[in-house]
Amino acid sequence: MEDFVRQCFNPMIVELAEKAMKEYGEDPKIETNKFAAICTHLEVCFMYSDFHFIDERGESIIVESGDPNALLKHRFEIIEGRDRTMAWTVVNSICNTTRVEKPKFLPDLYDYKENRFIEIGVTRREVHIYYLEKANKIKSEKTHIHIFSFTGEEMATKADYTLDEESRARIKTRLFTIRQEMASRGLWDSFRQSERGEETIEERFEITGTMRRLADQSLPPNFSSLENFRAYVDGFEPNGCIEGKLSQMSKEVNARIEPFLKTTPRPLRLPDGPPCSQRSKFLLMDALKLSIEDPSHEGEGIPLYDAIKCMKTFFGWKEPNIVKPHEKGINPNYLLAWKQVLAELQYIENEEKIPKTKNMKKTSQLKWALGENMAPEKVDFEDCKNISDLKQYDSDEPEQRSLASWIQSEFNKACELTDSSWIELDEIGEDVAPIEHIASMRRNYFTAEVSHCRATEYIMKGVYINTALLNASCAAMDDFQLIPMISKCRTKEGRRKTNLYGFVIKGRSHLRNDTDVVNFVSMEFSLTDPRLEPYKWEKYCVLEIGDMLLRTAIGQVSRPMFLYVRTNGTSKIKMKWGMEMRRCLLQSLQQIESMIEAQSSVKEKDMTKEFFENKSETWPIGESPKGVEEGSIGKVCRTLLAKSVFNSLYASPQLEGFSAESRKLLLIVQALRDNLEPGTFDLGGLYEAIEECLINDPWVLLNASWFNSFLTHALK
């Protein structure tokens, strides 16, 4: 059959048919009958249009040997055979210029004389059956249908055959010839039987018995029966005036569509109040590491051994004292907790064999810090359901907080490069499918750009601490286990390095459900003086615990070393996601890939190498009050990664809501920029939904302020 098609039809028609099949993922070599049917249909469409023109008086004429001087316009616009995007562009342009109703499905032709779209059908079955299927599918009075068969029959809407007898006879003769040629090669029977009907779902299958009763029970309000509802749905035209559609849906809905212009949107209102505070599970830019290079000590890789080794690299310990108390906490308990950690580590060192894990003594300060015995007693509902004034606790509204500059600094810092590499090349996972080497090449380029990024350090730190906490929570439920906060990296010279950020002490952890909370106390080293931005550290008690000698350009200087202590909590599900923070690498790699794909499709070749190696080109990174910020491709990779990492570190219901709701406004603004003339109703309600999420979360507030910068520049 394939050979027959290639011999029987014009090469241009064959090429168009192949293209159409590929667009739908079909193979002309396998689905040969379909290949023949598409070629036949294309040829009929072209023959329908051939030789038909409109002269300068607007009359329809047939010209077979063209007079080059005649001012003639083609009578038919051919839509069939174009790729979908182009075809719809042609249809839209016809509808805009002629005011003809836009069809739901792509028609085959447009007749400029009769001002109507035409659907051409070629069938191997009865013409009237095929006609009904087409009419049922299109469901439009406006599109004219004309069906031809291989036996010389035809059928058209209202018996209006559009063309003269001779033109139609030419088409019928050609179809008859194709049929005979196929028959002589023994191909006709298979071709005739392979025709499937128009793929519409049979609409009227009967529902009986239980399903019928359930259907009647589950109707929307105001409908008495399933028939009543079906009739309403069948009569519902999806196109047309939106206001009418809404009022048709419900009498209560009354929406006026307002045009959305450059002057329409206002900036988001950010909350007032004291500045927002740090709420991440561990310190980010303020963290300080005690490190050992090329670790080779006994028990290397066992966290407690590594931690003790790191602690020994520091000699400036001093008697700790509180420099910034926690407003609501019993601060001496935090001080005692740190002293206890030091004492117990000292005790371990004096033992002959260091244990692999360390459970802290359950002292009063740790019981207080970990909320031991603080949970309200659970009472069986049966025992208290008769109490008349049983009620849920009143909970206060969260206090509103304003945006503080520290969160932007945190983000900027996360985008920076460090002098160590935090991931090996294979951290993103090996190729599974043989997707050539393009995927590996992209991954390697991307990894090179982000392996030294501070956001990548946060990923590895997050993965480590969450894994260790979840393990301890399951393995030592009743114990106050001491968990060192550790990360590993490689220096510029490729030497291995183990870092200690501080310690976590885990509380009781009988975690049955995903959301059950385990309390922990974190104690983290830092050189940041908390008195510079006290509001950032509202949830912390900060101790001064030592003096550190730092090498600077002017020689060695001594700086106080602080310990940031706070009570915190997490759950199984949060730890599970924390353990999977490496996904952030994948998410940002995919965003970069879509940028490369866009470039590649324009240039029609893979642009991976050029994309990463053209150092002169800059790319948009984000919006700031100064305008659109641009940077190198490496900076783009690191910024996208930092955004993904912060979405994980600062995950919250406020962020979920803000992302979902602000996206709607973003799409409307994008539509305006693309000159699509968007209309909206209840824009105030959308603003309300967005601003409801702006309460006190630093990352959400920063995103909202970026959104405002975007609005300002997008609408200039």
Curated annotation (Swiss-Prot):
Annotated residues for binding of Mn(2+) 1: 41, 108, 119-120
Cofactor note: Binds 2 manganese ions per subunit.
Motif (Nuclear localization signal 2 (NLS2)): 184-247
Positions with a binding annotation for Mn(2+) 2: 80, 108
GO biological process, one term: cap snatching
Cystines in this chain: none
GO cellular component terms, semicolon-separated: host cell cytoplasm; host cell nucleus
Motif placement: Nuclear localization signal 1 (NLS1): 124-139
Domain of life (superkingdom): Viruses
Enzyme class: hydrolase
E.C. numbers: 3.1.-.-
Keywords: Cap snatching, Endonuclease, Eukaryotic host gene expression shutoff by virus, Eukaryotic host transcription shutoff by virus, Host cytoplasm, Host gene expression shutoff by virus, Host nucleus, Host-virus interaction, Hydrolase, Inhibition of host RNA polymerase II by virus, Manganese, Metal-binding, Nuclease, Phosphoprotein
Main location: host cell
Modification after translation, per record: Phosphorylated on serines and threonines by host kinases, including human casein kinase II.
Localization per record: Host cytoplasm; Host nucleus
Cofactors: Mn(2+)
GO terms, molecular function: endonuclease activity; metal ion binding; RNA binding
Family to which this protein belongs: Belongs to the influenza viruses PA family.
Primary role: Plays an essential role in viral RNA transcription and replication by forming the heterotrimeric polymerase complex together with PB1 and PB2 subunits. The complex transcribes viral mRNAs by using a unique mechanism called cap-snatching. It consists in the hijacking and cleavage of host capped pre-mRNAs. These short capped RNAs are then used as primers for viral mRNAs. The PB2 subunit is responsible for the binding of the 5' cap of cellular pre-mRNAs which are subsequently cleaved after 10-13 nucleotides by the PA subunit that carries the endonuclease activity.
HAMAP family: INFV_PA (MF_04063)
Subunit note: Influenza RNA polymerase is composed of three subunits: PB1, PB2 and PA. Interacts (via C-terminus) with PB1 (via N-terminus).
Protein name: Polymerase acidic protein
